[in-house]
Amino acid sequence: MAELLLGVNIDHIATLRNARGTDYPDPVQAAFIAEQAGADGITVHLREDRRHITDRDVRILRQTLHTRMNLEMAVTEEMLAIAVETRPHFCCLVPEKRQEVTTEGGLDVAGQRDKMRDACARLAAAGIQVSLFIDADETQINAAAEVGAPFIEIHTGCYANAETDAEQAKELARIASAATLAARLGLKVNAGHGLTYHNVKAIAALPEMHELNIGHAIIGRAVMTGLKEAVAEMKRLMLEARG
């Protein structure tokens, strides 16, 4: 069984920063801490509306990361140009709707083969490895192999959102079957979306999995497990100011 890697998505550090229009918390600092804690890579989604990660974040992260940068992005001319200029180690192509809270589903690779083939070729020519964010669907997996993507990232949202054990088991079986097919076609398999401390183990146990990209759950846990130290430090500074 191959080594399983963790890509930490730091988008929500930027979400918190942008909520008040400040320069903190700094996604670059968060990336450094994540790397020190064992992250194998850092994932950021540069959305068209720049709601969290910014172009500046992407440039600085590319220059400062000690691990690998995975840039999630829509398949648009603007984003392709940014990727070719920035040259992250990986690009994960995702569908994007401006009104969505987070990415809601996988790419329709089968329905836009030429567009995906061109994007994969353009990124590969810049030395960037490409993954396609797709549902655990046989048609989409076959299409991903056809358009020349070396990686897929299986959308685990339906698994994560399953309301019963039976539903979750059904979704897990779909993901396992999809991963087996992808590996048979020569694709490397990543997964992500909605993975938490409570549901990650079953996905991590699948032998075909190469990397899991997880963000919201990690940042949410960090708010709690790091909160004691943050509160104590603030109180110390306040008392220090009073002499």
Curated annotation (Swiss-Prot):
Q: Is Cytoplasm a UniProt keyword of this protein?
A: yes
Q: What is its EC number?
A: 2.6.99.2
Coiled-coil region(s) at which residues? none
Q: Which Gene Ontology terms of cellular component type are present?
A: cytosol
The main place the protein resides is cytoplasm
List the active-site residues. H45 (proton acceptor), E72 (proton acceptor), H193 (proton donor)
- Sites binding 1-deoxy-D-xylulose 5-phosphate sit at D11, H12, R47, H52, T102
Q: What class of enzyme is it?
A: transferase
Q: A single Pfam family, by name? A: PdxJ
Q: Which domain of life is it from?
A: Bacteria
Where found in the cell? Cytoplasm
Q: Which residues bind 3-amino-2-oxopropyl phosphate?
A: N9, R20, G194, G215, H216
Which pathway, per its entry? Answer: Cofactor biosynthesis; pyridoxine 5'-phosphate biosynthesis; pyridoxine 5'-phosphate from D-erythrose 4-phosphate: step 5/5
The chemistry this enzyme catalyses reads:
3-amino-2-oxopropyl phosphate + 1-deoxy-D-xylulose 5-phosphate = pyridoxine 5'-phosphate + phosphate + 2 H2O + H(+)
Its assembly, as annotated, is: Homooctamer; tetramer of dimers.
Q: Which family does it belong to?
A: Belongs to the PNP synthase family.
- This one is known as Pyridoxine 5'-phosphate synthase
**From which source organism is this entry?**
Salmonella typhimurium (strain LT2 / SGSC1412 / ATCC 700720)
